[in-house]
Amino acid sequence: MESSSTIDPAEVAKFEAMAAEWWNPHGKFKPLHQMNPCRLDYITQQIAAEFDRDLSAPLPFEGLRLLDIGCGGGLLSEPMARLGAEVIGADAAPRNIPVAKLHAEQSGLTIDYRNTTAEALAAAGERFDVVLNMEVVEHVADPLAYLTACRELLKPGGLMICSTLNRNPKSFAMAIVGAEWVMRWLPKGTHDWSKFITPDELYDLIRKAGLDPVDRKGMVFNPVSWSWSLSTRDLSVNYVTASVRRT
């Protein structure tokens, strides 16, 4: 794997240590498993709208080349492959790749998993219709350089979906104190609150990277139903954005 200025070795090491847990819905990635239906709802709706696809079709994303950056064990890569996309999953943590490959094989899916970075793929001339950049930007050393590499990975007219965590007292209380210290859904230190990014900051970075932000929504956890939903108004903790490369 080529080195990159945006890769934070300490952040990679955190996820390396949890690699075997990816497909355990009750393990260390339980929050992602719970959030996944909400993430997939947003992703599929945005792709369908941008590329005029019918989600009721058997393979609505057939013909689209999709990159899942920070793919981990493949929680998003696999559903995208089932919808017909040609999927490349990239992760900077080497131990995640064999876990993802094995699960895809067991699921009868063809997914190209690679231990590489956004910068290395861009330098190699790889281009995609869709780039998924989910819960990654808060873990990199240089968000603007990273998002610029994501822009280079998109074909003109391509779509980037980016999700992250807002930075405010509520997100500290819920994502750090609640999720890591009290509920212990995640190991302590999984997130660094100082690296969280407000929606306005992210929009500014996306524009500076050369992309046009077109949508953003909150992803809100309901502790009563124990489920996640999209919100047009509440972006106070988790949120997701859609951006397009125009030229």
UniProtKB/Swiss-Prot annotation:
Family matches, as Pfam families: Methyltransf_23 (PF13489)
Binding site for S-adenosyl-L-methionine: R39, G70, D91, M134
Keywords: Methyltransferase, S-adenosyl-L-methionine, Transferase, Ubiquinone biosynthesis
Catalytic reaction equation(s): a 3-demethylubiquinol + S-adenosyl-L-methionine = a ubiquinol + S-adenosyl-L-homocysteine + H(+); a 3-(all-trans-polyprenyl)benzene-1,2-diol + S-adenosyl-L-methionine = a 2-methoxy-6-(all-trans-polyprenyl)phenol + S-adenosyl-L-homocysteine + H(+)
Keyword Methyltransferase on entry: yes
GO MF annotation terms: 2-polyprenyl-6-hydroxyphenol methylase activity; 3-demethylubiquinol 3-O-methyltransferase activity; polyprenyldihydroxybenzoate methyltransferase activity
InterPro entries for the chain: SAM-dependent_MTases_sf (IPR029063), UbiG_MeTrfase (IPR010233)
Biological-process GO terms, alphabetical: methylation
Pathway(s): Cofactor biosynthesis; ubiquinone biosynthesis
Top-level enzyme category: transferase
Function of the protein: O-methyltransferase that catalyzes the 2 O-methylation steps in the ubiquinone biosynthetic pathway.
NCBIfam families for the chain: UbiG
PANTHER family hit by this protein: METHYLTRANSFERASE (PTHR43464), UBIQUINONE BIOSYNTHESIS O-METHYLTRANSFERASE, MITOCHONDRIAL (PTHR43464:SF19)
Record-given protein name: Ubiquinone biosynthesis O-methyltransferase
